[in-house]
Every structure is written in structure tokens, then in C-alpha cells.
Amino acid sequence: MNEIYLFGDSAAQGIVLDESENYRVSRAGCVRLMKRSGYPIRNYAVHGYTVSQGLECFRNTKTDPGNPCVIEFGGNDCDLDWDAVSQDPDHFHDGKTPLAEFRNLLKQFVQEARDRNLDPILVTPLPLMSGRYYRWVSKGRDAGRILRYLQDDPESISRWLERYAIAVRNTAAECGCHLTDVRAWMLEELDYPSLICEDGIHPNEAGHEIIARKAMEHFPRKG
């Protein structure tokens, strides 16, 4: 293994929310921690990316055969247009990438990685803290109308995301490729809420440390 190619979103990029409520790339992000431990990762993850954007990035990236290709999406794909929700809470709003399309694009990503003789590894999206995330997306919007769309149940946001995590697991099984269930790793932590930023969705630096440690246990470095 000469290199590990990583395509993903803000979680893989190492984004955290600071005390001023600004997003920044942390020097203690999970990938940076792994690179410091000798993991040869080429990180193409970008804050806000969906699987279609990641696939386009992959198509424009030169890769060498025989290396792992880590694919980490779902958090942005499932996200809603919260402006539209707050303006029209009485009609259905789908995710940025509808679930069936998400599955198909994941399978396409896996196939194109294999066509380049890479070893695809799918990663589940992180769980979120529904209450925090509801408060976060309600800022500057009509919180009552958003809550009406959620049928007075902010926890439904987490269940909506879970559908995309299940799709990642099922796609890995159907395609016969490796699965890294980061979602399960985080939920195993009894103090999970303390590992998530105030926006309810991004891991903080303590969370990134957990992800890095478990990833290195899961994929011990060779050589």
C-alpha cells in the first residue's frame, strides 16, 4: 500500500465548529492524526460535498492501482433545504441526494474505483445530535415552522440520516467491499454527546481523536 485515497465531506476533512461558531479545519482532525502516525493518506474530502461531487472529484483525480479508496458520504446527501422547509413546512422535502440516487451513485463510485484496480472502502455517516442540529438549522429561520415539518419531533432528523447509513452498509454488502462503520464506533462511546460540536453534526477534536484511534486499530499500518 503506497497511498490511501480518501473522498468525503467535512468529517473527513477535519472540520470543527469553534467557539465563535465558525467552521475551520482542525490541526487535530482524524486524518491529520493518522497522517502523523505514518498513514499515507491523500485527502480529497471537501466540506459540504455530496456523493455526486465526490465522484466527480474522483474522476478528475489521478490514482495508482493497488491502493485503498475510502468513500465517506451521506451527511450532506441526506440534508434538507432548511430555507425551503421553513417557508413551506406542509409539503415533503427530499434530501440533497434522494436515497435511491444515493445508493446508485455509491455503487457507481465502487465500480469506478474497481475499474482503476483500487480497493473501495465505504464509510458510514456519523450520527448526529438531533436537538442540537434542530436548534442550529433553526437559526435565522422560523423554528416553529421547521418543528411543524418535523411533526414536533426533532429526533426524526436522526432517523432520516439513519436511512443513509443503512444504505451505505447495504451497498457494502451488495458490492462485497470493505465497510468502516464509523457511525457504530461513535455510538459505542457512552459520552458520545461530548464528542460532537454545538451544531449537532460535526465531531469536535475529542471526537476526531476517537475516530483516528479506532481507524488505526481497524486498519493497522503495515511496514
Where do the protein language model's features map onto the residues?
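A short acidic, helix-capping loop that chelates divalent metal ions and anchors anionic groups
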Residues: 13-17, 52, 79-80, 131-132
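Structural motif
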Residues: 48-58
